[in-house]
Every structure is written in C-alpha cells, then in structure tokens.
Amino acid sequence: MRSIERLLSAATLTAALLTAMLVAGVTPAAAQAAADKITIRFTWKLKGEYAPLFVALDKGYYKAEGLDVTLAEGSGALTVIKMVGIGQEQFAYGPAVNAVQAVSQDLPVKIVSLYQASTPMGVISFPEVPLKSPKDLEGKSLAITTGETFSDMVRPFLKLNGVDIEKVTRVQMDNSARATQFMARRVDTMAVFLTNDLPKMEHVTKTKFNVIDVAAFGLKVPGAALIANSAWAEQNPELVRKVLRATAKGYADAMADPAAAAQTFQKYLTLKEDPGVLERQVRVTMASTNAPAGKPIGWTDEATWAACLDLLSETGNLKVRKALDAYYTNAYLQ
C-alpha cells in the first residue's frame, strides 16, 4: 500500500512540475535543450566599433540561435588571440592582421569572418605640428599604445614610406598615459584608431587635428574579424554558423541605423560615453564595414588575404608564409 502511495505522490509531483513548466511557457524538450554557452572576447576595452555585436545581443539574435553569448573585454590582441589558440576562449573579436601573424607562428586559430577590409589606423598631431605625410614623422616623437595593432605595424608602415626609423622616437605606453602625454604636448604625434580615438579626442579638445590615414599611405591590412579556435570550429561548425548569422544581423541593423545602434550600445557601458561621440564612432565604423554585394557580411576573397600576406612578407612582419586557407575561411558564412 505504501508503495502505491509513493508512486501516486511521485506522479502528482511530476504532474505539478509539468503544469508549472507549461504555465511558464517552457516545454520539457526546451528545458532539456539548454542554450550553448559562447564567449566572444574583444581584443580591447569596450568601444564604439563593437556596437553591432551588442545590437545582436540586445535584440536576441544570439538567443534565437540557441546561444547564450557573453561579450567580454580584452587587454590586447596578442593576449586574447593566444587565449583562443590554447582553447581558453572560443572566439576573439579584433584585428585580423594579428591573427594572420599568430597563424604563421603555428597558433591554431582561424579567421571565420572579416568585418573590416582595412584596419582604420591613423597618426595625429596638433595643428601647429606639421604632419602631412609619414616622412613628417622624422625628428618627432610618436606615442603608441602597448598591445594595439599599430604597435606591431609601425615598423612596416615607416619602411613602406621610406621613413628613417631611427629618426622617429617611438614611445610605448598604456592607453590612458598615451592620451595624457599627447594632450599635454609631451609627445608630438599619437597613433589612433580613426573609428574610436579620433572622434573622442576631437570632442574633448575641440580641435581639428592633422591626420595621416595609415591605409592611404600603403599599410592596408585587414581589420576587425571574428577569430575562432581552429579545432573547436571544425568540431562545432553549426555553432560557428549560428554565431556568424546572429552577428551579421547585428551588423545589418547597425548599418541601417547607426544612431539606434549607438543608443543600444550605451546601455552596456559602465562608464557612459558622450552620445554624440559614440554615435560618430558607430557611424564611422559602419561606413568601413566589409559587406560585399551579393555575399554575406564578413565574406572576403583570396585577393584580400594574398595582398595582406604580400605586405607582411615584404616588410619582414611574416616569418613563415602558409597557404591562404590556413588563415581564413568563408565556409561558415551563410
């Protein structure tokens, strides 16, 4: 009799749980199918160019793909890409050129989507400091942030433009110190991201700086990309596709309405940015987005990567050159 009572009690409890789940809109199958946890780690602190991914997160595009995505800050491209290579993270979001160099050094990572065909790097000076071409950097000091892309690219940039490297005083420091030193005019010039640093600096100083666009002077290397652990991507192709589909939707929305994307991103910032600066950052970033006609956002052709490898090889920044498919793939894009 007691066994029958226990069975009845268990059945009653099960029925109650099922009823509660159905009332809450959760089916037993859905309860078992937990969302796949994914971390996308940026290679730097939060900035306007990351807005499309937060749009995808905010609008539920990742969730709709069955993903539980965490968007996390980083502290430098080399560090974050290495974390992906050793399997500590699944994805890095940052400069493709650093991933290319990592692959050549046998780190098992691969670029699965490229969102900027060219890295928006620049060098600025105050109006009274002449700066029209790279040659003008001779005899001047140049502030560079440790861990940022240009710190690795400054030598090839100067070499490409016939600048005597020994005549340029390169001063490496952290991001906040770099800006402080430049604002106090203790350094003559400063390396910046045109999509992030420049809008902020111009807003703070109310100054129109002299600007060298690095890409316009020959150093055109692929920019923002999603970089995956190679083995993990091969073992989880559908998860990679889901991440790229959702991210592309965030990009499409941000391209269609940069102002709304900036407002969405602002919600996720602990330290709020000036709304005008943030909107300008997003607009400039969206204008540089790699969205080829008739192809998915993030798709690239072989010529882009061949040109990148040629440039890095010619300037001595690529010790070992591998086959193109070692560096990138379009296979996960739909």
Give residue ranges: language-model regions.
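Bacterial N-terminal signal peptides
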Residues: 10-25
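Sec/Tat signal peptide C-region and signal peptidase I cleavage site
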Residues: 26-32
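Short, surface-exposed acidic
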Residues: 165-169, 271-282, 318-326
